[in-house]
Amino acid sequence: MPPSDVTMRVWRGDAKGGAFKDFQVPAAEGMVVLDVIHTLQATQAPDLACRWNCKAGKCGSCSAEINGKPRLMCMTRMDTFQPGETVTVSPIKTFPLVRDLVTDVSYNYEKAREIPSFTPGPKEADGTRRMWQEDVERSQEFRKCIECFLCQDVCHVIRDHPENKKQFAGPRFLMRIAELEMHPLDVNDRLELARAKAGLGFCNITKCCTEVCPEHIHITDNALIPLKERVVTEGYDPLVWLARKLTGK
């Protein structure tokens, strides 16, 4: 089937300002949005800024908002749109714009550095460490994260209230805290970090982060809610409080 033109409405501009611009771009069968953006760069807009790397849905670089929804450009097929539909591509909203479709995501790296790394306890007497298979599988789900930061982008706590960024780590890094906190071999206590510095209390479990995750990680159900339960048990459970009073610990 020969390529047919599609209308691509792409954001052009930088931190000082910009606007959407329409382009007619040929799109062949099997193309994804990133293919069309590359075609646009090659034929009409060579200065269009766009971040990408693997084009296989594994690096998380090509995050954008496509028709208003945070998605990976390399995993969004053109045949999912209606014939004649205008496809709007804009930069992810939550982070400062650098230029065109590229944003400054350094906030995420700053939050990552605030989380203490994996800290294993002493080995068993025979020199090994053992884990139950269910514990292995639980943390494996969280490690599927490709750090596309779509969950960070869609989270209304920082999307609509950028002033919360200093005190809220966002779903990606709360999930990282949960992963380490649930690891049976880790001895570092991160519950106070989750409560006080990472801003777990800001999360009201709307599940928007789970809905946009390209790796289909159950961020809310398997990470955020269990982490909230652990924080509440540790800090507010009357039985835990009584036990501390009696034992002095």
Regions found by a protein language model. Give the residues of each.
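Eukaryote-biased recognition of intrinsically disordered, low-complexity regulatory segments
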Residues: 3-23
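Short, contiguous acidic and Ser/Thr-rich linear segments
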Residues: 20-32
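Ferredoxin-type iron-sulfur electron-transfer modules in oxidoreductases and energy-metabolism complexes
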Residues: 31-43, 90-249
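Active-site phosphate-binding and catalytic loops of NTP-dependent enzymes
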Residues: 45-51
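Short, structured protein-protein interaction patches enriched in aromatics and acidic/basic residues
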Residues: 54-62
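Extracellular/mature segments of secreted proteins
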Residues: 62, 82-83, 211
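Glycine-rich phosphate/adenylate-binding loop and adjacent beta-alpha elements
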Residues: 66-89
